[in-house]
Structure formats: structure tokens, C-alpha cells
UniProtKB/Swiss-Prot annotation:
Database matches in InterPro entries: Galactose-bd-like_sf (IPR008979), Glyco_hydro_2_N (IPR006104)
UniProt record, GO biological process: carbohydrate metabolic process
Family, per entry: Belongs to the glycosyl hydrolase 2 family.
Protein name, per record: Putative inactive beta-glucuronidase protein GUSBP11
Segments of this protein annotated with the region Disordered: 1-20
GO molecular function: hydrolase activity, hydrolyzing O-glycosyl compounds
Domain of life: Eukaryota
Amino acid sequence: MTAAETGRGKPRLGGGSGLGGSPAAVVWLHVGATGRDAVSPREPVVAAQAAGRPLKLPRRLLRQPTPGLRGAESGPTVDMPVPSSFNDIGQGWRLRHFVSWLWYEREVTLLERWIQDLCTRVVLRIGSAHFYAIVWVNGVDTVEHEGGYLPFEADISSLFQVEPLPSHLCITIAINNTLTPQPCHQGPSVHDRHLQVGTILPPLHAPTFPPHPVVFLPGTGYPKGYFVQNTDFDFFSYAGLLWSLLLYTTPPTYIDDVTVTTGVKRDSGEGFW
């Protein structure tokens, strides 16, 4: 039985650090249809599978509410604790080296007062999603975030405080762990229309740290968007939901941010704020 099938029940939310307070958020991981098979960082290009990471996930995949993606359409699924690194928690080589889109999904039970009190502001906070994430709540595109090291959040009150009032909330997160040459990513890229099949390119002059090449092969012998990622750093690229997910509430008037201004008195060296 897949995680998608077992996840259809109503989970009980207990104490812990996972989504909604559960010790381990039950998720389903989609590792086939939305990406490529994993290839070794040192495997020759000629043996690599087609790889491509669109900057925006094709919306045709989610024209219907996300529960419709379960079952036959979801592909292979596994239970995954949150927070954790999906590619470091198992023992399989394929999962450990997977690079592309993966899917998390969890259904949670809403507190009745959250639904009925229109003055309650409900926020979904994601501590870390490495590296590029798109979040849906009840099938609605809610928030996107790029950069896997900082938290982000979204006010989701309007998504369920409407008639008919739902009793459950379906949270779906698509994460892509490809490290691309964008400014906030790590590593340069190489574009060459004349590369020979089987070529592995060395790192460039490393404008960012850590250095590694993302090699795009746009020649006629490759599918559109084909690339090979060769990691040359000496640590593992942990990916997935690396920190906890939280649902919390605030009143309509709330503190959004705090700025502390400090200074030093020149005559005494005394600090103040």
C-alpha cells in the first residue's frame, strides 16, 4: 500500500515537531513522472537520462484539486517524516541521488474555531524547503519560494473560511532540489552547442561557493532542457522539507516585524537601543 493510499484517512494530530504537531508528517513522494531517473554525478553524459527543471512547474499538473493526483496518477510514493532530508533518510542509491521535482502532501483536521471565527488569521509557515518550492492549499496555488535556507509563510485564512466550510485542509508542496546557476544558487553553468556525447565538463572559475557545473546540452541529440549536474563540493546536498511546518493563528491586528536600531555613545562607548 502506498503512502498516498494510507494518507487518505484522517490523521490524528498529537505532540511533536511535525506538521500540525504530529511527530512525523505523513507525506507522499512523487519521484517518477515529474522528473528524471537519478544519474550518478560522475556518470558520462551519454548514459544520463533526460533532465530538466522548469523555473515554474507546469500548471497543467494541478488544474484539479491535489487529491486527484493520488493513486494511479501519483506514481511511487513513500512515507516521509518531516522535518528530514528525503534523499538522506533511506538506503537506496536512486532516492539518494534523485534530482528533480518531488511532492509532499498532508491532510490535517482544522479546529472548528479557526473555521468559524472570521477574525482569526491562520498562517502556514514552512521552516525550510530546499531548494525551490511551490505550495498549494486545497488545490489553490498559494505561495512560491526559492532558496532552501530561510523560512517563508502565507496567510491561508481566505482559502477555507468560506462556504461551504471544510473540516480538513490539504497541503501540497512541490520541491525541486536542482542547483541551478541563478544568483542565489550555487555554481556556474556551461552552454555549448558543440559538445560531443560523453563529455563531462570541469568546473568553471567558481563565481560562487561551492563550485560545480550545471551542464546544459542543447544539441539536436538531446531532449529540450537536457542537463547534467556534476557536484564537485565535498558535502551532501540535503534536500526536502528540512525544518518543521507549522499552522498558527493571530488576531486581525498583529506584529508583522520588529526592527531594533542600535548605537554607541562616542563619549562613553556605551551601547544603546
